[in-house]
């Protein structure tokens, strides 16, 4: 329950909102000191383990890289770094908003938290765009499906997010009060209006725009997959049903993890400057704190999603060792004098043409047939 205290007064009985510097309302946040340490701890351990396994597969088992695997690798790096930033926050909230470390480390932890959160969002966007091009324009996507282009895009994503999150190092600070040092995730009172403006820009640039792009991509893919093939009738083939379900799961996870967090955080920041009742502000504050673990859970769910979408990675993880023998077409390529990069491009073309042929077989197969092939997204 929140109570009016007057602007910039101290709090009573340890119920001061740890993210605020002398705000006019006093919030009862005892639930936060249980919810956040437990939820961050639950996310941290499996998040590190799952993404470590993913990175092992990418670095040690995967021999051929394309745009999709490149984006997934950087997504795994981002999620692993995000999970690695959680132990200090677990300790901080378990101690009741007491930060025994330096101000520099406080700034760094908050910076890593938001940097890797938004890197994950942008790499999910890159994967979605790549899949969309592969479904809608499979041949034209060959040029942009090369690993070297994906590496450039991934590098641009890291530079963009690091540049956008650099102001966090300026805004975030610590404050001592009643023998307790608080590591704020906002700013000092005199900078709060600027921080809200900055957060609004980041909301649009690093969440709203990527979310809209992902939504459009998956709607277009679903429309293409749900469109009946020429000369066929009956229900949707099993492969297409599976692909549509995968699309629905990706959208649901993205919306569940990121949308509530960003909506409640925007309301939390915006309404603090309005003359609202403390009861309303306390409800918004509680909603914001509850949605924080949802955003963190994405680092555990991402490995499951891209393993489901990339069945080739699952085979690499399952097999004792990756195939090393030459493909049947290798001697012919050697006779033609193709370089390694040319052979890679040839293989990519064959994969796409093979996928197109599989898609045509799928579309011509009656509903319920056991010969239906999976469509690669």
From Swiss-Prot:
Cytoplasmic side: 60-70, 130-152, 221-246, 310-377
Name listed for the protein in its UniProt record: P2Y purinoceptor 2
Membrane topology: Multi-pass membrane protein
Gene Ontology terms, MF aspect: A1 adenosine receptor binding; G protein-coupled purinergic nucleotide receptor activity; G protein-coupled UTP receptor activity; signaling receptor activity
GO BP annotation list: blood vessel diameter maintenance; cellular response to ATP; G protein-coupled purinergic nucleotide receptor signaling pathway; G protein-coupled receptor signaling pathway; intracellular monoatomic ion homeostasis; phospholipase C-activating G protein-coupled receptor signaling pathway; positive regulation of mucus secretion
Main location: membrane
Residues annotated as transmembrane: 33-59, 71-93, 111-129, 153-172, 195-220, 247-269, 288-309
Function: Receptor for ATP and UTP coupled to G-proteins that activate a phosphatidylinositol-calcium second messenger system. The affinity range is UTP = ATP > ATP-gamma-S >> 2-methylthio-ATP = ADP.
Compartments (UniProt record): Cell membrane
Positions of disulphide bridges: 106-183
Lineage top rank: taxon: Eukaryota
Sequence segments annotated as region (Disordered): 318-377
Keyword Magnesium listed: no
Keywords associated with the record: Cell membrane, Disulfide bond, G-protein coupled receptor, Glycoprotein, Membrane, Receptor, Transducer, Transmembrane, Transmembrane helix
Tissue: Spleen, testis, kidney, liver, lung, heart and brain.
Ranges of the Extracellular topological domain: 1-32, 94-110, 173-194, 270-287
Pfam family, one: 7tm_1
Ranges of Basic and acidic residues composition bias in the record: 339-363
Organism whose genome encodes this protein: Homo sapiens
Family statement: Belongs to the G-protein coupled receptor 1 family.
Gene Ontology CC: one annotated term: plasma membrane
Listed InterPro entries: GPCR_Rhodpsn, GPCR_Rhodpsn_7TM, P2Y2_rcpt
Keyword Cell cycle recorded: no
Glycosylation sites: 9, 13
């Amino acid at each position: 329950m929140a109570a009016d205290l007057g602007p910039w007064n101290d709090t009573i009985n340890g119920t001061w909102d740890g993210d605020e510097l002398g705000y006019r309302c006093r919030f009862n946040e005892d639930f936060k000191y249980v919810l956040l340490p437990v939820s961050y701890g639950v996310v941290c351990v499996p998040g590190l383990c799952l993404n470590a396994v993913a990175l092992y597969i990418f670095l040690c088992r995967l021999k051929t890289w394309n745009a999709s695997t490149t984006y997934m690798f950087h997504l795994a790096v981002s999620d692993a770094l995000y999970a690695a930033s959680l132990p200090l926050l677990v300790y901080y909230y378990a101690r009741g908003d007491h930060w025994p470390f330096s101000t520099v480390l406080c700034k760094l932890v908050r910076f890593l938290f938001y940097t890797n959160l938004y890197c994950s969002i942008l790499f999910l966007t890159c994967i979605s765009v790549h899949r969309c091009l592969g479904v809608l324009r499979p041949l034209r996507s060959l040029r942009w499906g090369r690993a070297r282009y994906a590496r450039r895009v991934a590098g641009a994503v890291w530079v963009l997010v690091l540049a956008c999150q650099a102001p966090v190092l300026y805004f975030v600070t610590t404050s001592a009060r009643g023998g307790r040092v608080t590591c704020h995730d906002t700013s000092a009172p005199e900078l709060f209006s600027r921080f809200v403006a900055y957060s609004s820009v980041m909301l649009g640039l690093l969440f709203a725009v990527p979310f809209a792009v992902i939504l459009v991509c998956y709607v277009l893919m679903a429309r293409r997959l749900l469109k009946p093939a020429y000369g066929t009738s009956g229900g949707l083939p099993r492969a297409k049903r599976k692909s549509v379900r995968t699309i629905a799961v990706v959208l649901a996870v993205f919306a569940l993890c990121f949308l509530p967090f960003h909506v409640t955080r925007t309301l939390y920041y915006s309404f603090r400057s309005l003359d609202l009742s403390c009861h309303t502000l306390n409800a918004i504050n509680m909603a914001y704190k509850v949605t924080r673990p949802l955003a963190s859970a994405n680092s555990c769910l991402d490995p499951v999603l891209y393993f489901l979408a990339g069945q080739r990675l699952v085979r690499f993880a399952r097999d004792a060792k990756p195939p090393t023998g030459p493909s049947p077409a290798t001697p012919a390529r050697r006779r033609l004098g193709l370089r390694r990069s040319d052979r890679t491009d040839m293989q990519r073309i064959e994969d796409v043409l093979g996928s197109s042929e599989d898609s045509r077989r799928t579309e011509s197969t009656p509903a319920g047939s056991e010969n239906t092939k999976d469509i690669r997204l």
